[in-house]
């Protein structure tokens, strides 16, 4: 019934496209007049549009004419005129939606339309893509259109200085990777002045390969971290012990990706730890003093049994490098958290890097939800439309192709074993190679790529391998995968963003010419030769059937399979796609094996035979839908928890910005001093209590620790003194201490010093708070066993932790302000710069680049007081006299000598 109604009325997408075509007619009606304009008149349209916007017009009011102008500029600059379907894609993007356009339909050119239009508002437009190569390529090629129309273009890649980034971000249109944008956002919120920040306020972002960024990478947080204690030796010891465990010592669930020790496994581990003198004889792994070891054992277990080399990670230059499960690319600089990366380093016997503590983090989900207007482009989004709508409030519109798709998607072939499957793949590749038809073989991992490569090598079939190990040649290899007799093996969607042109990509081949060694005439001759060669090969390839895409197994997501299929048949080209499966494939084995095995047994499948059966296809699709649903729930659940931290992050970042903007820090200091003075006095002199109940000794200690005040004992000895009078005197005394500092150092210097102390203290308590939230998050799921909702419990406790953090901030801030002194002799720019460099070397994000340090704040005397603010040295502390300790970090060992952390000893009640 539903299918009949769809045929009569069309789908919602069909109706949307129909409406958009009426908009396109209006743009097309403007084309004749726009074409008559001179180059100068066309450029002046930009000035005209900006004036209209300043006079009250909206972007929608000028959208049709602006699109017509960009189309004409593109025709004049590049000789490329936007097709009507590309104009539809541009309108979809401008209206804050996601446009699904097939591979080869010119998404890069489509982005110029909404980017130009929205840049006219002079608030900045970010075009976001997945790697530095695409950023450089697209900004250079499309930048010529923008420049022709009088707009500036910026390009953000890894390794740029803050000055260069600031200039690029302040361009009208900026091309950047999602990683750089996210990290720059975190770094900006760790700077000490607004002038040091590089990003503009959030406005409009167009995300290329939007499904990759908002879906595939949604669970991957961007993290800036700093080093903590070195436990590399312990990781090595535990790794050796875990290698001795038996299969019966642990249980693993591949569906849920979990692993746990069995009862016998716990006993075995305890025995091994005892023999290695890591724990005391007869003590247990879960005894209080050994609890920290559980973390090391669990991570070593995961490293050895849940993570495979050349599938989940690879080892290059003595480093463990993560492989993106969706693209097959190396995730440069990324490290697994919670000690897992160290466990993998121990497993692979490479140098174990120090663990790091999170200083700032954000997920792409929450970063991109900051934009008032967001849109995206991809070749495959309809299967994820519900998630994109639910989480990001983004509708998906599937744009029709300019040319009819002639590609043939052949039925899957299922075999009993991997060997039989590889034999069938080899036979097909041989057939294609013999007739000259190019083949692209898609695999799910580096390991599978190399298995296929070995099979082809044994059969002497020339081929190229494209995976994370050869990332540098990625774009060139994939661009030439459509040449005559080409055989290319690629991990998943490696090379995404680069079209495969039948016959080869002449522009990229021309770039390989050594221009310096040739005369102009010889160079032109070489160029013409390449163009003629690729044109001839294109004819041969079309005659052979176009690009044949072979999938070696189904991915967990139908969308990834569709992306692989989309490599063939661009712009109406011929082509074929086919998937080869076996019962050994991960998806079949974990999610669909029992049902399908039963069908195969019923049908009596013999060795070497393939089977095509509708029931198997349905089972596979159900398995994929099951996994997609499971992954969606994980991302949705992650977002629910991350929203708690995100709300707190927004508060902290907004407060931080307000502190930086503030012209006078005295008001906050004064109000906080008054609040703490009342709190301390009432703690030791409770309102309405008898005099003999007052704890004057500890009141004196606390006032000295907090405000550097020595309490006048004569005052307390008065019979009629009240807690209000003591509070008033404390506030007045503290204020006089501050005023004396102002007289000694100048009000301006004190203002900047107080502002700096407040910012650094805020950074410190926020860092500790993130650590506390991490620990809370790890164990919160256990509350379900007590019939409590983990999310509600997490929200409640996270709020309590946040309140505690704010109280801690006030106390540490006040203590530091009243105890510090400034050595005026050392206020030198050179000292500040040197100190910055030292501090930078101890900071890194997932790229481990010290230039991204939160201390990379320049050498401005108004904000840089780091080297001249003195604190009490640990050596000068008297263990028996807490008043001599000054400010003590909560995670530092208590100065009293107990061996406990300060927060569990003298700092317990803080």
From Swiss-Prot:
GO biological process terms held by the UniProt record: intracellular protein transmembrane transport; protein import; protein targeting; protein transport by the Sec complex
Keyword Nucleotide-binding listed: yes
Cofactor mode of binding and number, as noted: May bind 1 zinc ion per subunit.
Record membrane topology: Peripheral membrane protein
Assembly information from the UniProt record: Monomer and homodimer. Part of the essential Sec protein translocation apparatus which comprises SecA, SecYEG and auxiliary proteins SecDF-YajC and YidC.
Highest taxon above the source species: Bacteria
Binding site for ATP: 86, 104-108, 499
Phylogenetic lineage: Bacteria, Pseudomonadati, Pseudomonadota, Alphaproteobacteria, Rickettsiales
Organism for this UniProt entry: Rickettsia bellii (strain OSU 85-389)
Cofactor: Zn(2+)
Protein name: Protein translocase subunit SecA
